[in-house]
Swiss-Prot record:
It catalyses: 2-C-methyl-D-erythritol 4-phosphate + CTP + H(+) = 4-CDP-2-C-methyl-D-erythritol + diphosphate. InterPro entries: IspD (IPR001228), IspD/TarI (IPR034683), IspD/TarI_cytidylyltransf_bact (IPR050088), ISPD_synthase_CS (IPR018294), Nucleotide-diphossugar_trans (IPR029044). Pathway: Isoprenoid biosynthesis; isopentenyl diphosphate biosynthesis via DXP pathway; isopentenyl diphosphate from 1-deoxy-D-xylulose 5-phosphate: step 2/6. One of its GO terms (biological process) is isopentenyl diphosphate biosynthetic process, methylerythritol 4-phosphate pathway. Keywords: Isoprene biosynthesis, Nucleotidyltransferase, Transferase. It comes from the Bacteria. It is an enzyme of class 2 (transferase). It comes from Corynebacterium glutamicum (strain ATCC 13032 / DSM 20300 / JCM 1318 / BCRC 11384 / CCUG 27702 / LMG 3730 / NBRC 12168 / NCIMB 10025 / NRRL B-2784 / 534). The record marks 20, 27 as: Transition state stabilizer. Catalyzes the formation of 4-diphosphocytidyl-2-C-methyl-D-erythritol from CTP and 2-C-methyl-D-erythritol 4-phosphate (MEP). This is 2-C-methyl-D-erythritol 4-phosphate cytidylyltransferase. GO terms for molecular function: 2-C-methyl-D-erythritol 4-phosphate cytidylyltransferase activity. Its EC number is 2.7.7.60.
Protein backbone atom coordinates (compact mmCIF):
# COMPACT_ATOMS: atom_id res chain seq x y z
CA UNK A 1 0.00 0.00 0.00
CA UNK A 2 1.12 3.55 -0.64
CA UNK A 3 2.69 5.12 2.44
CA UNK A 4 1.61 8.61 1.43
CA UNK A 5 -1.68 10.15 2.58
CA UNK A 6 -2.65 10.85 -1.04
CA UNK A 7 -4.68 7.84 -2.22
CA UNK A 8 -3.64 6.00 -5.38
CA UNK A 9 -6.42 4.15 -7.20
CA UNK A 10 -5.72 1.82 -10.12
CA UNK A 11 -8.24 1.00 -12.84
CA UNK A 12 -7.35 -2.32 -14.44
CA UNK A 13 -8.98 -2.70 -17.87
CA UNK A 14 -10.13 -6.29 -18.42
CA UNK A 15 -13.36 -5.88 -20.40
CA UNK A 16 -11.94 -6.27 -23.92
CA UNK A 17 -12.77 -9.32 -26.02
CA UNK A 18 -9.23 -9.82 -27.36
CA UNK A 19 -10.27 -10.96 -30.84
CA UNK A 20 -6.75 -10.60 -32.27
CA UNK A 21 -5.44 -13.15 -29.80
CA UNK A 22 -7.85 -15.64 -31.32
CA UNK A 23 -9.03 -17.40 -28.16
CA UNK A 24 -12.57 -18.33 -27.11
CA UNK A 25 -12.48 -16.22 -23.93
CA UNK A 26 -11.63 -12.55 -23.26
CA UNK A 27 -7.93 -11.84 -23.33
CA UNK A 28 -7.66 -10.93 -19.64
CA UNK A 29 -8.67 -14.49 -18.72
CA UNK A 30 -6.25 -16.29 -21.00
CA UNK A 31 -3.84 -18.39 -18.94
CA UNK A 32 -0.11 -17.77 -19.00
CA UNK A 33 1.72 -20.50 -17.12
CA UNK A 34 -1.25 -21.39 -14.92
CA UNK A 35 -2.16 -17.78 -14.10
CA UNK A 36 -4.40 -15.49 -16.13
CA UNK A 37 -3.16 -12.22 -17.57
CA UNK A 38 -5.54 -10.46 -15.19
CA UNK A 39 -4.05 -12.18 -12.14
CA UNK A 40 -0.54 -11.29 -13.23
CA UNK A 41 -1.41 -7.64 -13.81
CA UNK A 42 -3.21 -7.43 -10.49
CA UNK A 43 -0.27 -9.02 -8.66
CA UNK A 44 2.14 -6.52 -10.22
CA UNK A 45 0.01 -3.67 -8.87
CA UNK A 46 0.02 -5.21 -5.41
CA UNK A 47 3.76 -5.87 -5.50
CA UNK A 48 4.49 -2.27 -6.51
CA UNK A 49 3.36 -1.16 -3.03
CA UNK A 50 2.09 2.00 -4.71
CA UNK A 51 -1.69 1.64 -4.74
CA UNK A 52 -4.46 1.77 -2.14
CA UNK A 53 -7.33 0.47 -4.24
CA UNK A 54 -7.69 -1.52 -7.47
CA UNK A 55 -10.87 -1.44 -9.55
CA UNK A 56 -11.05 -4.19 -12.16
CA UNK A 57 -13.18 -3.32 -15.19
CA UNK A 58 -14.86 -6.44 -16.58
CA UNK A 59 -17.67 -7.12 -19.02
CA UNK A 60 -20.96 -8.03 -17.29
CA UNK A 61 -20.91 -11.57 -18.68
CA UNK A 62 -17.49 -12.22 -17.11
CA UNK A 63 -18.15 -10.73 -13.67
CA UNK A 64 -19.06 -13.99 -11.93
CA UNK A 65 -16.15 -15.84 -13.52
CA UNK A 66 -13.72 -13.08 -12.55
CA UNK A 67 -15.03 -12.87 -9.00
CA UNK A 68 -14.79 -16.63 -8.47
CA UNK A 69 -11.29 -16.74 -9.96
CA UNK A 70 -9.92 -13.90 -7.85
CA UNK A 71 -11.57 -15.16 -4.69
CA UNK A 72 -10.08 -18.61 -5.24
CA UNK A 73 -6.63 -17.03 -5.66
CA UNK A 74 -7.03 -14.88 -2.56
CA UNK A 75 -6.96 -11.67 -4.57
CA UNK A 76 -10.25 -10.24 -3.30
CA UNK A 77 -11.07 -9.07 0.22
CA UNK A 78 -8.22 -6.60 0.63
CA UNK A 79 -5.14 -8.66 -0.28
CA UNK A 80 -2.04 -7.06 1.24
CA UNK A 81 -4.24 -4.28 2.65
CA UNK A 82 -5.35 -3.06 -0.79
CA UNK A 83 -9.05 -2.90 -1.60
CA UNK A 84 -9.89 -4.85 -4.80
CA UNK A 85 -13.31 -4.72 -6.43
CA UNK A 86 -15.03 -5.37 -9.75
CA UNK A 87 -16.94 -2.83 -11.86
CA UNK A 88 -18.68 -3.35 -15.19
CA UNK A 89 -16.75 -1.92 -18.12
CA UNK A 90 -18.24 -0.49 -21.31
CA UNK A 91 -18.28 -1.39 -24.97
CA UNK A 92 -15.18 0.67 -25.76
CA UNK A 93 -12.08 1.26 -23.69
CA UNK A 94 -12.98 4.91 -23.05
CA UNK A 95 -16.41 3.81 -21.82
CA UNK A 96 -14.80 1.32 -19.43
CA UNK A 97 -12.44 3.92 -17.98
CA UNK A 98 -15.29 6.38 -17.52
CA UNK A 99 -17.31 3.71 -15.73
CA UNK A 100 -14.35 3.07 -13.45
CA UNK A 101 -13.88 6.75 -12.70
CA UNK A 102 -17.55 7.09 -11.85
CA UNK A 103 -17.21 4.16 -9.44
CA UNK A 104 -14.58 6.00 -7.42
CA UNK A 105 -16.15 7.74 -4.46
CA UNK A 106 -14.95 11.31 -4.74
CA UNK A 107 -16.13 11.80 -1.17
CA UNK A 108 -13.48 9.29 -0.06
CA UNK A 109 -10.78 10.51 -2.44
CA UNK A 110 -8.96 13.78 -1.87
CA UNK A 111 -8.92 16.33 -4.73
CA UNK A 112 -5.29 15.49 -5.43
CA UNK A 113 -5.80 11.70 -5.49
CA UNK A 114 -3.90 9.80 -8.17
CA UNK A 115 -5.46 7.35 -10.61
CA UNK A 116 -3.61 4.77 -12.70
CA UNK A 117 -5.09 3.30 -15.87
CA UNK A 118 -3.55 -0.05 -16.80
CA UNK A 119 -4.18 -2.71 -19.44
CA UNK A 120 -4.49 -6.19 -17.98
CA UNK A 121 -2.91 -7.49 -21.20
CA UNK A 122 0.41 -5.93 -20.11
CA UNK A 123 0.72 -8.81 -17.70
CA UNK A 124 4.51 -8.76 -17.23
CA UNK A 125 4.79 -5.07 -16.34
CA UNK A 126 7.50 -4.69 -13.67
CA UNK A 127 6.25 -3.31 -10.34
CA UNK A 128 9.13 -0.82 -10.38
CA UNK A 129 7.73 0.82 -13.51
CA UNK A 130 4.35 1.20 -11.82
CA UNK A 131 6.01 2.90 -8.87
CA UNK A 132 7.94 5.18 -11.24
CA UNK A 133 4.73 6.47 -12.82
CA UNK A 134 3.11 7.09 -9.44
CA UNK A 135 6.19 8.90 -8.17
CA UNK A 136 6.15 11.30 -11.13
CA UNK A 137 2.55 12.29 -10.43
CA UNK A 138 3.44 12.76 -6.76
CA UNK A 139 6.15 15.15 -7.94
CA UNK A 140 3.56 17.40 -9.56
CA UNK A 141 2.76 16.09 -13.04
CA UNK A 142 -0.90 16.09 -14.10
CA UNK A 143 -0.50 13.23 -16.58
CA UNK A 144 2.33 10.69 -16.89
CA UNK A 145 3.02 7.99 -19.47
CA UNK A 146 5.78 5.36 -19.64
CA UNK A 147 7.46 5.33 -23.04
CA UNK A 148 10.12 3.52 -25.05
CA UNK A 149 12.07 4.68 -28.13
CA UNK A 150 10.85 3.11 -31.37
CA UNK A 151 13.28 0.96 -33.32
CA UNK A 152 11.33 0.71 -36.58
CA UNK A 153 11.05 3.48 -39.13
CA UNK A 154 7.48 4.82 -38.99
CA UNK A 155 5.61 6.02 -42.09
CA UNK A 156 2.52 8.18 -42.16
CA UNK A 157 0.30 6.96 -44.99
CA UNK A 158 -2.78 8.05 -46.91
CA UNK A 159 -6.24 7.11 -45.53
CA UNK A 160 -6.38 4.04 -47.77
CA UNK A 161 -2.93 2.96 -46.60
CA UNK A 162 -1.57 2.79 -50.13
CA UNK A 163 0.71 5.82 -50.36
CA UNK A 164 3.37 7.15 -47.99
CA UNK A 165 2.70 10.75 -46.96
CA UNK A 166 5.87 11.37 -44.97
CA UNK A 167 8.38 9.85 -42.56
CA UNK A 168 8.37 11.35 -39.05
CA UNK A 169 11.71 11.85 -37.33
CA UNK A 170 12.19 8.65 -35.35
CA UNK A 171 14.11 10.51 -32.64
CA UNK A 172 10.89 12.33 -31.78
CA UNK A 173 8.71 9.21 -31.60
CA UNK A 174 7.97 7.04 -28.59
CA UNK A 175 5.95 3.87 -28.05
CA UNK A 176 3.52 4.42 -25.18
CA UNK A 177 2.74 1.84 -22.50
CA UNK A 178 0.63 1.59 -19.37
CA UNK A 179 0.03 2.19 -16.53
CA UNK A 180 -0.63 5.83 -17.23
CA UNK A 181 -0.96 8.07 -14.18
CA UNK A 182 -3.12 11.14 -13.65
CA UNK A 183 -4.49 13.50 -11.08
CA UNK A 184 -7.94 12.06 -10.51
CA UNK A 185 -9.71 15.42 -10.59
CA UNK A 186 -8.16 16.34 -13.95
CA UNK A 187 -8.90 13.01 -15.61
CA UNK A 188 -12.50 13.15 -14.39
CA UNK A 189 -12.86 16.69 -15.77
CA UNK A 190 -11.44 15.63 -19.14
CA UNK A 191 -13.84 12.69 -19.35
CA UNK A 192 -16.81 14.84 -18.37
CA UNK A 193 -15.98 17.28 -21.16
CA UNK A 194 -15.43 14.51 -23.70
CA UNK A 195 -18.64 12.60 -22.98
CA UNK A 196 -20.68 15.82 -22.85
CA UNK A 197 -19.49 16.85 -26.33
CA UNK A 198 -21.65 15.33 -29.10
CA UNK A 199 -18.79 15.86 -31.57
CA UNK A 200 -15.43 15.87 -29.79
CA UNK A 201 -13.61 15.46 -33.12
CA UNK A 202 -11.50 12.45 -32.22
CA UNK A 203 -11.54 9.00 -30.66
CA UNK A 204 -9.05 8.65 -27.79
CA UNK A 205 -6.80 5.63 -28.19
CA UNK A 206 -5.49 6.01 -24.66
CA UNK A 207 -6.14 8.23 -21.68
CA UNK A 208 -3.11 10.40 -22.36
CA UNK A 209 -4.54 11.37 -25.76
CA UNK A 210 -7.73 12.44 -24.00
CA UNK A 211 -5.69 14.60 -21.64
CA UNK A 212 -3.84 16.12 -24.60
CA UNK A 213 -7.22 16.97 -26.14
CA UNK A 214 -8.25 18.49 -22.82
CA UNK A 215 -5.16 20.71 -22.85
CA UNK A 216 -3.06 19.07 -20.13
CA UNK A 217 0.69 18.58 -20.36
CA UNK A 218 1.62 14.90 -20.56
CA UNK A 219 4.99 13.98 -19.05
CA UNK A 220 7.06 10.94 -20.08
CA UNK A 221 8.97 8.51 -17.87
CA UNK A 222 11.08 5.54 -18.86
CA UNK A 223 9.02 2.50 -19.84
CA UNK A 224 10.12 -1.12 -19.85
CA UNK A 225 10.25 -3.74 -22.63
CA UNK A 226 8.58 -6.21 -20.26
CA UNK A 227 5.44 -4.07 -20.27
CA UNK A 228 4.52 -5.16 -23.79
CA UNK A 229 0.86 -5.78 -24.57
CA UNK A 230 -0.21 -9.36 -25.23
CA UNK A 231 -2.35 -8.81 -28.33
CA UNK A 232 -1.49 -11.50 -30.89
CA UNK A 233 -0.51 -15.19 -30.71
CA UNK A 234 3.12 -14.17 -31.26
CA UNK A 235 2.93 -11.89 -28.21
CA UNK A 236 1.62 -14.82 -26.19
CA UNK A 237 4.48 -17.02 -27.39
CA UNK A 238 6.95 -14.37 -26.24
CA UNK A 239 5.23 -14.04 -22.86
CA UNK A 240 5.31 -17.82 -22.42
CA UNK A 241 9.01 -17.94 -23.22
CA UNK A 242 9.76 -15.15 -20.75
CA UNK A 243 7.78 -16.74 -17.93
CA UNK A 244 9.31 -20.14 -18.63
CA UNK A 245 12.81 -18.70 -18.25
CA UNK A 246 12.40 -15.82 -15.78
CA UNK A 247 9.26 -16.43 -13.72
CA UNK A 248 10.96 -16.16 -10.29
CA UNK A 249 12.40 -12.70 -11.03
CA UNK A 250 9.51 -10.98 -12.81
CA UNK A 251 7.86 -9.51 -9.72
CA UNK A 252 10.86 -8.97 -7.47
CA UNK A 253 11.07 -5.22 -7.67
CA UNK A 254 8.96 -2.65 -5.79
CA UNK A 255 11.31 0.22 -6.30
CA UNK A 256 13.79 1.30 -8.93
Amino acid sequence: MSSTRIPVIALLAAAGRGTRLGGPIPKAFVTLRERTLLERSLQAMLTSESVDEIIILVSPDMETYARDLLRKRGLLNDPEGVRVRLVHGGGERADSVWAGLQAISLDDATPDAIVLIHDSARALTPPGMIARVVRKVHEGATAVIPVLPVSDTIKRVSPDGGVVVDTPNRAELRAVQTPQGFLLSELVAANEKFFADPNPGFIPTDDASLMEWYGADVVCVQGDPMAFKVTTPIDMMLAQRITDEAEPTIFEVPGD
